[in-house]
Amino acid sequence: MSKGLFLIWLISSFHLISFSTSSKDTSFVFNGFGQSNLALDGSATLLPNGLLQLAKDSQHQMGHAFIKKPIDFSSSKPLSFSTHFVCALVPKPGFEGGHGITFVISPTVDFTRAQPTRYMGIFNASTNGSPSSHLFAVELDTVRNPDFRETNNNHIGIDVNNPISVESAPASYFSKTAQKNVSINLSSGKPIQVWVDYHGNVLNVSVAPLEAEKPSLPLLSRSMNLSEIFSRRRLFVGFAAATGTSISYHYLLGWSFSTNRELSQLLDFSKLPQVPRPRAEHKKVQFALIIALPVILAIVVMAVLAGVYYHRKKKYAEVSEPWEKKYGTHRFSYKSLYIATKGFHKDRFLGRGGFGEVYRGDLPLNKTVAVKRVSHDGEQGMKQFVAEVVSMKSLKHRNLVPLLGYCRRKGELLLVSEYMPNGSLDQHLFDDQSPVLSWSQRFVILKGIASALFYLHTEAEQVVLHRDIKASNVMLDAELNGRLGDFGMARFHDHGGNAATTAAVGTVGYMAPELITMGASTITDVYAFGVFLLEVACGRKPVEFGVQVEKRFLIKWVCECWKKDSLLDAKDPRLGEEFVPEEVELVMKLGLLCTNIVPESRPAMGQVVLYLSGNLPLPDFSPYTLGIGSFTPVVVDAASLTVSFTSRNWSAPSASSSSANNSKDHEQPLEFKS
């Protein structure tokens, strides 16, 4: 069914655009803009009827639309092109009109430094006239700017690296019938044709109403060498538009372009979309609104006052039920947390961890905490949730982020932990703005997290499976000690028993291959820790798609380096020469051992601690040992992903913003039913 719909759509929209390329020329035509061959930014948008709208009905806007791929103007022959487009500039009722529209040729489509208003969305005050701009444009301008030597508010101009046109003229076209130039109002809201032809170092610009033929005499004709403007011949072509205090709707209806002397593909006016006409408000409606406004305002004021009263009354309200009495010593008041975070103000926002937002809070006696706000529902699930929060508070280890307690409101749970001033480890590994961690600092962090996992698996009152070990869940305290946090996926079970998990969770790249079929165990935590070891030593994420294929999967790449007797080639290049080769090799080999796809071949965390401390040598294995260096990513259909509160998932707040939230390349935790 979906394939049939796609074919119907493809056939019905094929008439909108046609591309033609050869080794000698490139041409295309848009009869309406119903395809995705354009790169849009700013306020530019495609309307359902095929219109390309460059500027919206707001002040100080700019929009750009360019062909996605640059056009290769052959360097073996003089630069040449012809283009024909139809546009309409429709002033917003009550305004005189915006700052017009430009046809642009540029080596880049990055106009983030450009300004709206008189700079047309392609120039700015600091780059005017700079040859480094490499910019050519034909402007249809409807605002007079005396600073730019413009004589009226209805003109056509040729711009080269500068909004001050090298040549301009009032908008008009040569009428064959009248044998003279006839004025044309660019802001009439009616479709206008524009032709720009450049051949033999002569640039011709013509305009005409939609119903007229191409004028036999151009409006502007200038001898110029465009090849001197552009340092390269791969150039983008497209359009820009801008508004200032005056506002217009800027529309493009169709566009034809060719690098040949003649347009090989002509516009079909019968296929062009219609230009909408903005409606002015009726005077009676305006009068009625003026009469009703005081009444409406009074009602709004009363509603606001009532809302403020209700809000203040409920501001510090909490939810407390009889079953929570036994947890009273672990509970914070909502008022204290509200004041500590300044009302959860955006200035106190640290980031988003698993299942909630994290804020910094300053409690009395100079106690700084991190407060995570987690949504919840269901009384039974909440009982289990709070019970596990309190159980987690009983865990005491120098390399765990300490959980201090909780607070509960209707539909919301607040978790309080110690604040970690140096943020998350992944920020220091992957953010170029953060200081580079030395090898000695990294090695101490690795040994600390290994010790914390050994404690969770062996020494705690119950076995704790973390299930989401990665650099973004390791926080750094004031002394840069590693603290394992964000226990949003954690599970508890008695020693000697098995975890009764009903869902496989984790982050892609860190999940053991057997997780879906066999469920979580301490040995799946070991696998994730192995990936974490490689992540820290190599300064790379477990899966990266923007690199060479052989380096895409970290586990496989490290193993391949070992096979070539060049294991140290995989280390983080930011370490420079300040590292201990034996320690780096130990960490990488241990990472490969922990990520063995044969679960029984992985070491326990007690052995890992001994390996890292040097009290136990690594077992005899090589990069060719069965299960070493194999990466089998856990893949799941998106439809089966769930995040279940009632399955007792909870998240202790990380004490600073995690770069998992700030990096688009970093995978988010996944949970799906096994």
From Swiss-Prot:
Its encoding gene is what? LECRK15
Alphabetical GO biological process terms: pathogen-associated molecular pattern receptor signaling pathway; protein phosphorylation
This protein's superkingdom? Eukaryota
Q: Which family does it belong to?
A: In the C-terminal section; belongs to the protein kinase superfamily. Ser/Thr protein kinase family. In the N-terminal section; belongs to the leguminous lectin family.
The residues listed in the UniProt record as binding ATP, with positions renumbered to this chain, are L350, G351, R352, G353, G354, F355, G356, E357, V358, K372
**Cytoplasmic side of membrane:** 308-674
* Compartmental location: Cell membrane
Extracellular topological domain ranges are 23-286
MF (Gene Ontology): ATP binding; carbohydrate binding; G protein-coupled purinergic nucleotide receptor activity; protein serine kinase activity; protein serine/threonine kinase activity
Record-linked CDD domains: lectin_legume_LecRK_Arcelin_ConA, STKc_IRAK
* Source lineage: Eukaryota, Viridiplantae, Streptophyta, Embryophyta, Tracheophyta
Q: Could you tell me what this protein is called?
A: Probable L-type lectin-domain containing receptor kinase I.5
